Amino acid sequence: MSEIGSSVPVNENRPLLTEDEVEAQANSSTVWPLSRIRVARCEWKLWGSLAFIFGASAYIYSFSRVMKDSFVLSRQLPIAISFLKTCFVLPISVIVTGIVQKLLVTRTISKVFDYTLIAFSFLYLLIGMVLLPFAEKIQPGLYFSRDIFADDKMAYKGFEFLFAIFLIFNEWTTSFVYVCAELFGSLVVQFMFLAFANEALTIRQSTRMMPLFYVISNILLLLSSESTSFYSKKVREWDYKKTCLITNSFFAVFGAMIAVTYLVKKYAENTILKKQLFIRTEGVAKKKGRKSSAGFSESMKLMAQSKFLVAMVMNALFYYAGTNLIESSWKNGISVAADANNMEKRAYSASIVSGEQRVVGALVAIILLTPISTLVQTHGWITMAIVPPLVTLVSSLVIFGSAFFNYSNYPEGKTSVILSSLVKGYKPNFYLECNIGIYCVSGMKIAKYAFYDISKEAISLQIDPLYRPRLKAVYDGLCGKLGKSIGSLYAMFWSVMGYNDVRAAAPITLGMWLIISPIWIYSVIYLNRKYNQSIQTSSPIDLDLFSGKKDLE
């Protein structure tokens, strides 16, 4: 794949603009919102193709994410989500990431992206046309596991926590849907596209276009929320057979959409990226070095060498772990609220979660079309980086506080791990936990897409290009999965202790988060200091090695 600004024969009849002239053209508009859509005329086809790839992938992931959650909540136990994330998603992700890293040693990111899109197109078609339609024939009977654990037969033996695990295998087709959707999000949306775009675009193009990619993806996230909202309403009208038929068809359509995405990518490579769009006047000095892989052991070695990397890892781990803990508690609350309101769990869950997607999609798109998207350049890196820890702190107070109050009051007879006597005997407030909780969970996702991701990419661009891929593999690739798994392991611990609802430990979880928040904020302040030093000296960011050396081994 040719880089946009590479030296290729130029058509003398159509003089090319220089990179500076393209930048000036892209930034020439002064009327909002055109002033925020900073794309030059010669870049529109390229931007449109990349935006379609990212937007379509984001739509597929956001819709299938709602579907996978509603499947698990309706056919399994809420705690099963934690087991799936830790015991299935994490190890499979590590294996797949290792395979990807091995492939990248001998193949380009473009080729690996091709393989990934083809594989997921096949998997989604398989889900929609085979696994779900024939689920009753290829998996154990519906009541196989439920009969084993009926009437608390296993409770007195201390094996009640195994119910969730039995259901995961009993309903293995829905478990497969969950794992497949999670992998699609982490591989295609969060890693492959961004890596492909970084190769296709110059740094200055990336700075302008990346916020716009997130605008498009969040507009489609808004469309996804409307789709899931419409679906949840229709489920109440359709009979079981029609519901299954339409639900299965969604995944078949997604498989076809991924195939179209692959074709658009090939079009961009074969017709747009092979042509020179402008004459580069600013390049990135690339040091020569061996192409490195970053497996788990290599990642740990890297982290042990650099204080900077430790801070980046903490920043990622705390965000993903906090999001997982808060969202798990919130989704458990949704499941309990559905019972309290005598509503079908899948429809109730889809209606609530689609509301969350609606808020996130609209607000992120608006925020990224305002000067907020350039806060790093205008007001400093910390103005964006500090938002996620503050939003997560507020969300933890609301979600864990309401979960603590509601858990001990519905259903009757339940008591939380500690302090249940303080709130026992009151009427549960599911409106606060579920409906107001939407805004807390939405706030954390807005903080990620509009603040965390932008600030992370900004500081990543200051890392020496020789080390950047290795370091990003740690805090971008590995830590997202580890952070989610930490939250899931926490929920699993309480399940083993006899609490299948993580909300039972809400006061303990809140106390832990009040300790973690200051540490997270301190790590952001440290990273801001390193970023500012790099900008002021116009040099790669100081990795601040524990050994005092200047270079990684």
From Swiss-Prot:
Sorted UniProt keywords: ATP-binding, Cell membrane, Glycoprotein, Membrane, Nucleotide-binding, Transmembrane, Transmembrane helix, Transport
Phylogenetic classification of the source organism: Eukaryota, Fungi, Fungi incertae sedis, Microsporidia, Unikaryonidae
InterPro entries: ADP_ATP_car_bac_type (IPR004667)
Protein name: ADP,ATP carrier protein 2
GO CC term (a single one): plasma membrane
A Pfam family it matches: TLC
Family stated for the protein in its record: Belongs to the ADP/ATP translocase tlc family.
Gene this chain is encoded by: NTT2
Task of the protein: ATP transporter involved in the uptake of ATP from the host cell cytoplasm. Provides the microsporidian cell with host ATP in exchange for ADP. This is an obligate exchange system. This energy acquiring activity is an important component of microsporidian parasitism.
